[in-house]
């Protein structure tokens, strides 16, 4: 058993913790941290981490944690407006505060709440008693009110780590501790609604105290205070000043019995259960509650069947990596392979964290290894924020090390623990066994297969783009009147807003400078010809630097093909993503994006087959909402955008013009992503009131869509998560946020996820069902991008493969509306799209 972190040490030092303040601070600092059940725990985690940091840096004879009592304090009675300006307590803060108090009790620390007094007064009184007995005192808080207590033996320990001492106050402000209350009284404190002296800021207050020494002396000599306007401000707010002084001064005379020996031994088992319940796996280690890594029980290679595998690669990309180490674990016994590559031949299946990666590497070496159970997939289904093995290990009680044997052991333990957590979750288990686990086999094969690139074409395109970029630069310089660095945002800012005097439409958050973002430039497109040229320059430069130039260097020398990585546990909706390179971001509709697709070509004697789900998200919406009008449009094979326009504008379908159809299309897809009337008015360049009317007419045309959205949000608020048709979850705790902008962003996320996630599940199901049949026909699955699947088949059988794939995708799962797939074939990806 690992030695527990020493919580008490007889070093003559006492730690006082401002519990309420620390909890509130971490509540907002770590917003969004939840358990896999969607339970918000950010304040609890942040509080525990802050405590650990303090405890590790120093040993303490006693630890006291002080919270504000529920009853009003004497300050509320003296000043009715005290703290009246504070925002209401967030809804899930009280529940987390209760958990923090439970944690304090389990740690054996003394917990105090004194009715009628704030935590500041309790802390101040506690600080004075040990100080008198010769102990050093540390007060863990970020509350600046308590800086008045610092002395030779009392220091404030800021959660970020620095100590506030008399020397620190003097160096930072030129103030002595006894002047701190006077300083606070002069400047006031908006967070506590303390008025201070209106018009006097920190700079003036420091100057006054430097000259007069104290507030008392300043007030005695008020008629001599200069300048006159400062003197008059103080005279006009004397009552506020005296009140602020009274309220800022903490009490040190509370009738408290302080026993430095009253702390208890921590409840080790209770603490372990608490941390496991909240999924604070990393804290188990930090508190010293994990089983000590006992010497591994080792056995000779090869391992028995069903063992979990651990491995270490020289780099993340398996097609390019060296296999540095290989081990396996079964029932706690580990087996190390002396020669990792040779050891692969003894495996029939890869079970373990990142199983797909090892299967890809094995395929590169000519071995057909099937990826099997992967705890990463289980963790991802529990909570899609579980995206890395390091994070999963920390969360569920383990450590991701660079040792292959420990990785194998970790995989076995995590698999067992995660399956326990999924007991009773039939939908999630179905997704694991029927979708995610078999899909990892498909993706491993796709990664190992890769896709051929026309390198000569890309090199020629690069030269062409370089010339076009140079021409655009000359145009920009001509319009600006002089050359400048187009890649320098500061120089561009000066040209646009100082020299050409274009309107500045926004500022950057970090620096406050005038923004030159794409959104700002789009809004300025019509304001000056230079903007259009800059946007074109940016697009060409980005695609040249991101795709056209790097792609040839990513072609593997042994295969002559490009091998992208498909990430199965990276998105919150269940969609796949790709990396090294990221093919999802190649523009589909722009001419240049299409020219990049032209570089993806078929092997000689083969053809590419491109299959694209048509309007799959709108079809999923029809099924989920059960809206009869929406369902009927798809069942009858009508154009959804034309029909929507017909209902929205009150005209027959044959009278719908292109502008009407475009408006309806924007609304159809905008509804899926929670587009506001303001955004719609910008997209369509129409008045705001007209955009509001468009959205309202849409919901009148499809009334059950609105009802489904409202039902989805209501269930999400109650359960803390939303789910797809197949039960895939996304936790959305901010559905209950009090801040309107935060809540509305969560709402858009919440009703989009079931649609987008169901579409992703349908694509995955289709891939799993189609894969073995393609292999039988000698065809290959190459890429999955957005709603599209790219295959490669011998030319002689390409049409048969296309027909088979189209049928498999359209019949992936029965819905209330038919799924429709558009098919094309060609020598390259662009021509296959038609």
Curated annotation (Swiss-Prot):
The UniProt record lists the keyword Transferase: yes
Highest rank taxon of the organism: Bacteria
Tagged with keyword Aminoacyl-tRNA synthetase: no
One GO term (biological process): DNA-templated DNA replication
Disulphide-bonded residues: none
Keyword terms of this UniProt record: DNA damage, DNA repair, DNA replication, DNA-binding, DNA-directed DNA polymerase, Exonuclease, Hydrolase, Nuclease, Nucleotidyltransferase, Transferase
Molecular function as annotated in GO: 5'-3' exonuclease activity; DNA binding; DNA-directed DNA polymerase activity; nucleoside binding
EC number assigned by the record: 2.7.7.7
InterPro entries for this protein: 5-3_exonucl_a-hlix_arch_N, 5-3_exonuclease, 5-3_exonuclease_C_sf, DNA-dir_DNA_pol_A_CS, DNA-dir_DNA_pol_A_palm_dom, DNA/RNA_pol_sf, DNA_polI_H3TH, DNA_polymerase_1
Ranges of residues in domain 5'-3' exonuclease: 176-262
Catalytic activity line of the entry: DNA(n) + a 2'-deoxyribonucleoside 5'-triphosphate = DNA(n+1) + diphosphate
Temperature section of the record: Thermostable.
Polymerase, as annotated region: 412-834
Recorded coiled-coil stretches: none
Family from the record: Belongs to the DNA polymerase type-A family.
Biological role: Has 5'-3' exonuclease activity and no 3'-5' exonuclease activity.
Protein name: DNA polymerase I, thermostable
């Amino acid at each position: 058993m690992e030695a527990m972190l020493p919580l008490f040490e007889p070093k003559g030092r006492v730690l006082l913790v401002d519990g309420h303040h620390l909890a509130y601070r971490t509540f907002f600092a770590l917003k969004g941290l939840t358990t896999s059940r969607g339970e918000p725990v950010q304040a609890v985690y942040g509080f525990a981490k802050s405590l650990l940091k303090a405890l590790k840096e120093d040993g303490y004879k006693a630890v006291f944690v002080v919270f504000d009592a529920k009853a009003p304090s004497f300050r509320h009675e003296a000043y009715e407006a005290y703290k009246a300006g504070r925002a209401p307590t967030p809804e899930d803060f009280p529940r987390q505060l209760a958990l923090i108090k439970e944690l304090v009790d389990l740690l054996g620390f003394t917990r105090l709440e004194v009715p009628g007094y704030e935590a500041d007064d309790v802390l101040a009184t506690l600080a004075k008693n040990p100080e008198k007995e010769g102990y050093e005192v540390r007060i863990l808080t970020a509350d600046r009110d308590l800086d008045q207590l610092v002395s030779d033996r009392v220091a404030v320990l800021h959660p970020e780590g620095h100590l506030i001492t008399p020397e620190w106050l003097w160096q930072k402000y030129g103030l002595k501790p006894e002047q701190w209350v006077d300083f606070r009284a002069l400047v006031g404190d908006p967070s506590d609604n303390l008025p201070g002296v209106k018009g006097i800021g920190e700079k003036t207050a420091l100057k006054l105290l430097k000259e007069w020494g104290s507030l008392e002396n300043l007030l005695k000599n008020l008629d001599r205070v200069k300048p006159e306007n400062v003197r008059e401000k103080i005279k006009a707010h004397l009552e506020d000043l005296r009140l602020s002084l009274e309220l800022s001064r903490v009490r040190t005379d509370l009738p408290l019995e302080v026993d430095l020996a009253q702390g208890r031994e921590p409840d080790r088992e209770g603490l372990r259960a608490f941390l496991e319940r909240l999924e604070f796996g990393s804290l188990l280690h930090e508190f010293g509650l994990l089983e000590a890594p006992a010497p591994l029980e080792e056995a000779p290679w090869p391992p028995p069947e069903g063992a979990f595998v651990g491995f270490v690669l020289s780099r993340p990309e398996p097609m390019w990596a060296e296999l540095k180490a290989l081990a396996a674990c079964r029932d706690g016994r580990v087996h190390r392979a002396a020669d990792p590559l040779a050891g692969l031949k003894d495996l029939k299946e890869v079970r373990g964290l990142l199983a797909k990666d090892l299967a890809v590497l094995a395929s590169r070496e000519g071995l057909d290894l099937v990826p099997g159970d992967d705890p990463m997939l289980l963790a991802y289904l529990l909570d899609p924020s579980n995206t890395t093995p390091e994070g999963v290990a920390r969360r569920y009680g383990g450590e991701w090390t660079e040792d292959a044997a420990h990785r194998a052991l970790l995989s076995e333990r995590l698999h067992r623990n995660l399956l326990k957590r999924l007991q009773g979750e039939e939908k999630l288990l179905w997704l694991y066994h029927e979708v995610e686990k078999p899909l990892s086999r498909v993706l491993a094969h796709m990664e190992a297969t890769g896709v051929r690139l026309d390198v000569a074409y890309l090199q020629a395109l690069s030269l062409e783009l370089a010339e076009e970029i140079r021409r655009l630069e000359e145009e920009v310089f001509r319009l600006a009147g002089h050359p400048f660095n187009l890649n320098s945002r500061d120089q561009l800012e000066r040209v646009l807003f100082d020299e050409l005097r274009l309107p500045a439409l926004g500022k950057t958050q970090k620096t406050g400078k005038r923004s030159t973002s794409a959104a700002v430039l789009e809004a300025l497109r019509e304001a000056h010809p230079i903007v259009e040229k800059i946007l074109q320059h940016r697009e060409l430069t980005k695609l040249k630097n991101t795709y056209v130039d790097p792609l040839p260097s990513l072609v593997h020398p042994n295969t002559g093909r490009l091998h992208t990585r498909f990430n199965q546990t990276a998105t919150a909706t269940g969609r796949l993503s790709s990396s090294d390179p990221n093919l999802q971001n190649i523009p589909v509709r722009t001419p240049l994006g299409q020219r990049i697709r032209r570089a993806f070509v078929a092997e000689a004697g083969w053809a590419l087959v491109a299959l694209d789900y048509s309007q799959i998200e709108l079809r999923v919406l029809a099924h989920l909402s059960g809206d009869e009008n929406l369902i009927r449009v798809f069942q009858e094979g009508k154009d959804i955008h034309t029909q929507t326009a017909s209902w929205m504008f009150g005209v027959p379908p044959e009278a719908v013009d292109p502008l009407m159809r475009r408006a309806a299309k924007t609304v159809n897809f905008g509804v899926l992503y929670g587009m506001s009337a303001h955004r719609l008015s910008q997209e369509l360049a129409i008045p705001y009131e007209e955009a509001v009317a468009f959205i309202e007419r849409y919901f009148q045309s499809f009334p059950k869509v609105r009802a489904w959205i409202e039902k989805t949000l209501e269930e999400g608020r109650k359960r803390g998560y939303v789910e797809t048709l197949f039960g895939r979850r996304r936790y959305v705790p901010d559905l209950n946020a009090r801040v309107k902008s935060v809540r509305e962003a969560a709402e858009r996320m919440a009703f989009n996820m079931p649609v987008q996630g169901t579409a992703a599940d349908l694509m995955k199901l289709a891939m799993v069902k189609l894969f073995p049949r393609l292999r039988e026909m000698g065809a290959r699955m190459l890429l999955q991008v957005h709603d599209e699947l790219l295959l490669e088949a011998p030319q002689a059988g390409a049409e048969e493969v296309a027909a088979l794939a189209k049928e498999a995708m359209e019949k992936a799962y029965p819905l209330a509306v038919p799924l429709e797939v558009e098919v094309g074939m060609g020598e390259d990806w662009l021509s296959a799209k038609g």
